[in-house]
Amino acid sequence: MSCFENRGDAATQAANDYNPFEAMAPRTPSKTPVERRNGRHVKANDIPPQGVYLPNNNYLAPHMRSPEYVQLSTAAAITLGIMGGRMYGCSCTRCLNLLLTYPEGCRANCAYCGLARHREADRDYADRNFIRVDWPAVPMADIVEIVARDPASSPFHRMCISMITHPRSEQDTFTVLKQWTDRIGPDAIPVSILSNPTTMTRDDVQRTKDLGADTFTVALDAATPALFDRTRGKGVQSPHKWSKYWEILLDACDVFGPGHFGAHIIVGMGETEYEVLHLVQELVDLGGHSHMFCFFPEQGSLMDHLPATPRDQWRRVQLARYLIDYRDVRVDAMRFDSAGRVTDYGIGAAELSAVIDEGVAFRTSGCPGKFRDDISACDRPFGDSPPSDIASYPFQPKSRDLKKIRRQLGIPVRVE
């Protein structure tokens, strides 16, 4: 698992306890040489895949396509036994994260993403880092065969299919989903869909449910329309629109129902805490959940020069989000300062202290697993931070972790 260092301006980061909008502008995408566009050289070389492909930019990538091939996270590959390695603090991941793959790659150009279209200038799609780690490519049939041997005893509590912006994304998602559910029942390992709203319809949302998915998520990522446009839309020559993402999110609300849909949100790209927590409340009021990521500059992205989210900003939002999502605290009961930072969480000091000491609020958030509704199966080990300064804990925080979290929150004194 690769862990890239934050290349942001340390002085800027030290001076602020939040990332303001004006300081988080992405670079302008550069033009890709014609011969590198749409995976042309990968298709021209047409090297046949030989089983598992481990990303290596020093070799010509083989010609791999979904639905026959999918990529999976480094953590999932280690847990599945496909590649060696260990993860700090945890022996496995509880979510089998799958990613559709094509030589053409993702046709969107999101500023913070390692899979963005502009990266075709220097790196094949199969070799790009995503959420800070490599994603080996594996035949889907091999993955199903391994898990289907004994799904009830599998370490995985959930499987997730991540779509990308590609003309075949919907149809191939249906094929991969059916291949899985034909062999592995949802009671043993439920399935989530991380959707691509730009190319989807309401009928597509319905079909994922009909084929056995139990949870549907939309990666809003940006907390406001302006931030979305700057990082995911025309600001970076990308096709996504805030309105279309919300259209599919509301379709998921209708089709999947309360507790079975949600949205990804990245904290620290220029929104205020007030803005992101009002979005969290809006999702809860619809019956959904928020799945939060701490911004960490992805190597090779258009934002890899920018500072990671300061830990105090992240911890405030993490804690407030948990209270809204799982403890029935409303954002209207919270207080914010003139910069939109949380100053009061809307509950008493003793109750707040108990929530902090339990530690669950600071674990990775995502679709639920089999332990508790508020403990995510999708633990994404170190996907938004290095192990030396953990943002989202993929394991239960220990006593020393909670002491550090309290310092980051500015709440050092435990109330008895």
Task: Place the predicted regions along the sequence by residue.
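Conserved C-terminal portion of the radical SAM core fold
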Residues: 214-215, 220, 224, 242-302, ...
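Short, electropositive alpha-helical surface patch
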Residues: 173-182, 214-217, 270-289, 344-359
